[in-house]
């Protein structure tokens, strides 16, 4: 007794099992997190080390090199990169996805602690920090006011908004963008300081001595004890202005005599505006695996409650909300599920033409789909675009087994058998076929489990959900479906009106197919050249279709990055960014929000468009319009970026090409030629390199002999320049219970050119004032401000933006060509960022594709007990791939992860049709028919089931191929590949498989 017979004999058991699947599925659905994609960012550990006053060369040789040397041996490292700059080095260790973040952090800490003995004694201890894979904000609350300063807004954002939002469940952290922290600014006048004989070091010492509060003990009496507190701290600008710096001949010199103190912003070289109004942005970062939509809803609710706590002249709005796109794209996919469900029901009814027979397989669809949510829950997945796409795809798949089972039982009832007996007989005959097609389909998804990197992590969830749905559907088809068929199906003496009207069409279809198949089998040799042409077509189209990681989506968001030449001032890049902002306002006056951010050397303008349904233009059209317009703004460089579908590197350009050499001189020599070729290449819209040799600097060469004679040491010179010019922290003060920095610096107007440095004085060991000009020589020079390593080599990374219509695959091909023309064998090249992910996913998908073919072949060989028969079925695969590529080529669809997964799926889908024909033909042969007659009868008898299951799969995916709205391009890519492959392969399979069968199938009669 098999499971189908058990279910027919015990209908309550079959019903209970189905209800349990539904119940667990619903529980899983209600507890799953919601996000856009699975987490695909690699674990990243950062190591930073400061060495005050050291230039990039010293940092590289004395700090970066020893640290890298030790870290390099840790297992599981994907890439090791570093940047050495004035006073600091930062090493970024990226691990493989399979490595646990905590383990990686502990390994790095261990290696760093071992390396510390090789570092300079007076450098700061290195710090190791984890970069959370999900640490990108999902939502920003913009705090604005027309009357208050950014300092006041920052305080409101920090004390009111941030404190409230941090308490929301599943929020990892809340940051403030554009924050202006209070500081006590000490502005110094070098001329007055020279007149009074005061140096910047004197001011630092005075602050240290006058702004101090130490524990002062207590007074103890017989009955009482009093704690003593020395009120040595200063809290206001007035107190700082009155601080005594020095006393000369009874004359007290205060800070106000040689400068002034004011309460101001610690960071004066940054700003942030939204729609032209200065603002600070409070951004919310979720915990890994959290439900992003629930967090966003909680933020909206909390902000509404907070309205009464905010001052009347302070308003808030939302700068961006990434969950809008997530909501919309998942809602679009959900509606696609319903559309697919309805279309599948219609196609089944049109073929079976009986509502009872239609209803039975259709019940399997919700059981399988709801059950899939329990699979997601057990596996720790989330509801995201990929798992929902898997659900859409399953609509057409899960019904196949139930259709075959129901039809087989129905045929027996029509012949006059009792429903109970028909159920047992029909289920027994089809039992093996259901099991074998299920194993075949699930086997296609096994290779995806072995895929590494980004694509592997992305599609593991997808493949698990489809495989889970198919397994549940076959279980339902073998248990609930036969039980239901025995209860619902009845023998009809007279067919319905609709059946009688449509039967001539189906009989005519059978006759046409029979005649055309007979004609084709007479000239069956045509099948061989058709197969060869198909393979050639695949080779040509595979290379012609452009490739990329994922199609670009309309996310209603565009970013323009601005960058000035090395050495440009903050004001220069600020004015340029404001020019770009004004240009954007003129091009898209109806934008929802335009946010500009500027810091020293670079800036960006982020444009949030209206929702897709509220505008008649696309994000891509706007981006192209802006790209053309900003070419006229030549004071600095600007580059338009549109966010890629996945990966955390949302701010970098798509092409990241790393040149590695053994010395920096080699890179300096080759980079201009390489970059010129990139600039001249029409594939790239813009290019830049991180390693610069054009940063202007003034080198202060100290005459050591002269300084020694005058009683001045090098440290005195360095400290005088540091405290006078660098805005160095001179201590801390407290205000309203919070700690803020004291920053000292010479007035901007008196340090705006190198000649101003000459007016700074220094005190020698005899207490005499000596003008700095007497001890030093100023030499203007250029040097790399930062030195880069990538995987232990000295490196330069060329970042390039792609021209309209170009893909990352084409960009990397062009880079490889330029590299082969320009570089000799002493150079090495590598990829980073999105480029590395793309290359790895391409090779990973090819591995999955080949493994899927091998697995299917081996499983079929085991099922048919033949190595020849599976080869016949495998011939359907090239037909399907050719169909997919033809549709992709004419539909202007790129070769991306979504379309490639569609192609891998086709292997299992089209193999099912071949299995039905070959297995039935083998049964006919074993019954005594010769090969030709057996395959002709099998193909004719299996025509309707094949057309019905193929049509249900195709119609289930039609809503994907014609998708609109948010996230449509991904759905279109997958839908077009599968629909195209299924359409062409279904038609050709009905002729090619019978023809090839007659040539190479196992002769079953001889075996008898």
List each model region and its residues.
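Hydrophobic transmembrane alpha-helices and their membrane-interface caps
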Residues: 24-36, 342-411, 418, 450, ...
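Helix-loop junctions and hydrophobic alpha-helical segments within the transmembrane domains
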Residues: 319, 326, 330, 406, ...
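Transmembrane alpha-helices and their membrane-interface boundaries in multi-pass membrane transporters
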Residues: 395-409, 431-450, 457-499, 605, ...
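Flexible hinge/switch segments at interdomain interfaces of large molecular machines
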Residues: 34-45, 81-87, 122-147, 175-181, ...
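Signature of alpha-helical transmembrane segments and their immediate interfacial
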Residues: 1-31, 430, 498-550, 607, ...
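Solvent-exposed, membrane-proximal periplasmic/extracellular interface segments of envelope transport
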Residues: 58-130, 191-212, 231-233, 571-653, ...
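Extracytoplasmic/periplasmic membrane-proximal domains and adjacent transmembrane bundles
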Residues: 6, 37, 48, 90, ...
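Transmembrane helices with small-residue packing motifs
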Residues: 12, 19-55, 113-123, 377, ...
């Amino acid at each position: 007794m098999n499971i189908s017979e058990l279910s027919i004999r015990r209908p309550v058991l079959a019903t209970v099992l189905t209800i349990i699947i539904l119940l667990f599925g619903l529980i899983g659905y209600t507890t799953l997190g919601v996000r856009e994609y699975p987490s695909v960012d690699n674990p990243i550990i950062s190591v930073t080390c400061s060495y005050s006053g050291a230039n990039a060369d010293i940092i590289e040789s004395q700090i970066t090199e020893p640290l890298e040397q030790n870290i390099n041996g840790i297992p599981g490292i994907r890439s090791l990169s570093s940047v050495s700059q004035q006073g600091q080095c930062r090493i970024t260790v990226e691990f493989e996805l399979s490595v646990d973040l905590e383990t990686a952090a502990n390994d790095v800490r261990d290696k760093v602690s071992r390396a510390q003995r090789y570092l300079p004694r007076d450098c700061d201890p290195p710090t190791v920090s984890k970069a959370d894979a999900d640490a990108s904000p999902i939502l920003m609350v913009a705090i604005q006011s027309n009357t208050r300063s950014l300092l006041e807004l920052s305080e409101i954002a920090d004390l009111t908004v941030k404190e409230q939002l941090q308490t929301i469940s599943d929020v990892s952290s809340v940051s403030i963008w554009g924050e202006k922290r209070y500081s006590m600014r000490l502005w110094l006048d070098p001329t007055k300081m020279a007149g009074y004989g005061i140096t910047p070091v004197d001011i630092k010492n005075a602050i240290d001595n006058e702004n101090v509060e130490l524990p002062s003990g207590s007074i103890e009496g017989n009955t009482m004890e009093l704690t003593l507190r020395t009120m040595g701290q200063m809290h206001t600008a007035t107190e700082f202005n009155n601080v005594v710096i020095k006393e000369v001949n009874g004359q007290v010199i205060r800070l106000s005599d040689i400068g002034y103190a004011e309460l101001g912003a610690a960071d004066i070289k940054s700003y942030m505006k939204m729609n032209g109004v200065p603002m600070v942005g409070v951004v919310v970062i979720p915990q890994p695996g959290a439900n992003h939509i629930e967090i966003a809803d909680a933020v909206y609710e909390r902000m509404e409650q907070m309205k009464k706590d905010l001052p009347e002249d302070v308003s808030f709005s939302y700068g961006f909300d990434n969950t809008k796109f997530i909501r919309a794209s998942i809602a679009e996919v959900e509606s696609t599920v319903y559309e697919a469900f309805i279309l599948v029901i219609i196609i089944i009814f049109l073929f079976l033409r009986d509502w009872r027979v239609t209803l039975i397989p259709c019940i399997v669809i919700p059981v399988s789909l709801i059950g899939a949510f329990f699979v997601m829950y057990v596996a720790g997945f989330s509801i995201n675009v990929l798992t929902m796409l898997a659900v859409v795809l399953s609509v057409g798949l899960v019904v196949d087994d139930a259709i075959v089972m129901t039809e087989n039982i129905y045929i027996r009832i029509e012949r006059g058998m009792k429903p109970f007996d028909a159920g047992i007989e029909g289920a027994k005959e089809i039992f093996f076929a259901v099991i074998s097609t299920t194993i075949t389909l699930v086997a296609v998804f096994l290779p995806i489990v072995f895929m590494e990197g980004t694509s592997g992590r992305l599609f593991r969830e997808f493949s698990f959900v489809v495989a889970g749905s198919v397994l549940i559907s076959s279980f339902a088809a073998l248990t609930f479906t036969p039980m239901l068929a025995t209860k619902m199906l009845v023998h009809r003496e007279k067919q319905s009106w609709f059946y009688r009207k449509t039967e001539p069409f189906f009989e005519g279809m059978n006759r046409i197919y029979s005649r055309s198949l007979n004609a084709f089998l007479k000239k069956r040799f045509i099948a061989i050249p058709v197969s060869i042409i198909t393979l050639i077509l695949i080779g040509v189209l595979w290379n012609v279709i452009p490739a990329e990681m994922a199609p670009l989506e309309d996310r209603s968001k565009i970013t323009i990055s601005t960058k000035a030449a090395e050495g440009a001032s903050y004001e220069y890049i600020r004015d340029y960014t404001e020019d770009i902002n004004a240009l954007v306002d003129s091009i898209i006056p109806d934008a929802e929000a335009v946010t500009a951010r500027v810091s020293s050397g670079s800036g960006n303008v982020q444009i949030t468009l209206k929702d897709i349904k509220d505008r008649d233009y696309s994000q891509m059209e706007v981006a192209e319009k802006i790209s053309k317009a900003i070419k006229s703004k030549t004071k600095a460089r600007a580059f338009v970026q549109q966010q890629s579908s996945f990966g955390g590197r949302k701010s970098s350009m798509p092409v990241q090409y790393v040149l590695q050499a053994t010395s920096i001189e080699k890179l300096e020599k080759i980079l201009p030629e390489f970059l010129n070729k990139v600039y001249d290449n029409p594939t790239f819209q813009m290019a830049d390199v991180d390693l610069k040799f054009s940063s202007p600097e003034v080198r202060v060469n100290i005459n050591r002999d002269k300084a020694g004679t005058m009683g001045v040491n090098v440290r005195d010179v360095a400290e005088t320049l540091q405290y006078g010019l660098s805005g160095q922290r001179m201590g801390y003060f407290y205000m309203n219970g919070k700690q803020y920095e004291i920053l000292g610096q010479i007035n901007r107007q008196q340090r705006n050119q190198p000649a101003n440095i000459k007016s700074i004085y220094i005190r020698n060991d005899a207490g005499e004032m000596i003008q700095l000009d007497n001890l030093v020589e100023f030499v203007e020079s250029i040097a790399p401000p930062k030195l880069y390593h990538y995987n232990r080599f000295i490196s330069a990374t060329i970042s390039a933006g792609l021209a309209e219509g170009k893909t990352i695959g084409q960009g990397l091909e062009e880079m490889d060509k330029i590299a082969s023309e320009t570089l000799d064998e002493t150079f090495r090249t590598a990829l980073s960022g999105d480029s590395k992910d793309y290359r790895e996913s391409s090779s990973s998908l090819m591995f999955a594709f080949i493994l899927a073919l091998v697995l299917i072949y081996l499983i079929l060989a085991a099922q048919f007990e033949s190595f020849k028969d599976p080869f016949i079925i495998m011939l359907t695969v090239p037909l399907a791939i050719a169909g997919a590529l033809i549709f992709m080529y004419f539909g202007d669809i790129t070769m991306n992860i979504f379309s490639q997964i569609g192609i891998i799926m086709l292997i299992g889908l089209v193999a099912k049709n071949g299995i039905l024909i070959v297995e039935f033909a083998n049964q006919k042969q074993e019954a005594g028919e010769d090969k030709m007659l057996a395959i002709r009868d099998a193909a004719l008898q299996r025509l309707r089931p094949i057309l019905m299951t193929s049509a249900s799969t195709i119609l289930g995916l039609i809503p994907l191929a014609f998708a609109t709205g948010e996230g449509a391009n991904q759905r279109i890519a997958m839908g077009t590949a599968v629909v195209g492959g299924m359409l062409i392969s279904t038609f050709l399979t009905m002729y090619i498989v019978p023809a090839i069968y007659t040539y190479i199938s196992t002769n079953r009669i001889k075996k008898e």
